Amino acid sequence: MRQLVRRGTHLGLLLAAFWLPTSPALAQEEKPIHMCPGCLAPVFTEQGKGSITPYGRIEIDAIYSSGNTNPLDPAQFNGYATAAGPNRNNTSTLNPRYSVFGIRGERTDGANSLLGVVEADFYGEKDVAGSVLPRLRLAYAKFSRKNYSLTVGQDWTPVMALHPDLIDFSILGYGGNLWQRIPQITFRYQFNENLEGLLTVLRFERGLYAIGGQRQVRPSAAPAGSGQGDAPFNDSSNDAFSDPIQHPYYGTRFAYNKDGKMLAVSAAYRYYRSAPAPGLTPGGFGSGGFTSGRDINSYLVGTEVVYPLSKTLKFSGELGYGQAIGQEFFRFGQDLNLTTGKPIRTLMGWGQLSWAASRKHTFLAGAGFDNPNDRDVQGSTANAGTQYKSNHRTYLTAIRPIWSDFYVGLEWQHLWTTWAVTTGPQHYQGDTYNVSFWYNF
């Protein structure tokens, strides 16, 4: 009992030290303040000196693609990530959507520092007039003190954090690179000059609801003419509140850096119990064939490496293995078999050689792969253009500044995709060619 009392007293003192003034003199100097969570005006302006810096990128991408290349989410124009079919209707486009505008706010008193970033691109859906709309890209605050930091808000995925350098805006998505910009709470700790570790929780705001027609929703009272236990239809106003995923991902990463070399290991996990997908016709996903009520253990383990081969040549890459890995890692629609509801296990990875031939010339050569377990995707007959048995990509890239921070880049990509269909041809190939101009300011 005495030990419990002592522990309780110690905890109380710690809480008091956090919430209460540190000295009577300080308490007399500082007046109480009514703080408002929704207010925008800064209050503690005397704590450190700050600055605000606008920044951004203006970009135009001229893209030519064979009819065999296709974005898996065309509404988002997220790059040409798969080889879609036998059609040879080649296409071209001029795309300004990868332009970015951001504001960075910083404050420090020498011991503590704050960094706030709000950043937007233009990959939002078009309005009724066909205008390109801005979309939230990053919005986070980072507090740092001594050898630790706390990041809260929407930032890049903190696990499997290494990415290739190619121009394509899918960043090798569906092709072995696991990435996303996602809401998170991440604590980082610097053990020494070379070793850093982190703990994180992360998830999309709307979970599976973000996938449109592939989303799951909990069963509700059956409307007239439908079966008991069917999921609500796509236009249900309750869908956003019926997401079966309640847990975020819980993740960790340890990275060792020295002399330009880096080795990192990552792991992430979450659990949920699957719910029905919106009912379509039997044989497709939905109440006709999608088996819900499964215990879904979604996990990811992986490693990342950067290794300089010479002063001008560098290798980087990553290798990951996981189950039920979906939109949180830019694998929309690849987490569960859309016909059976079974979680899909996947081996993924990529590698890249970067050659800095001179101060004004950089050349890249890389390849990536995403190979779901064939037994897990077996029987997936719905959305044959969505779920694949394998998806591979290679690329060659050249980058050169024209003047100052105005650049031109050339890129070629070749894609191989084997679709998870049971009849007809399954394997297709395609190419894309990209000429990009961008100005970083």
List PLM regions with ranges.
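Outer-membrane beta-barrel "beta-signal"
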Residues: 400-402, 427-441
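Outer-membrane beta-barrel biogenesis signature
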Residues: 25-77, 361, 400-406, 441
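Outer membrane beta-barrel
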Residues: 41-74, 84-209, 213, 246-262, ...
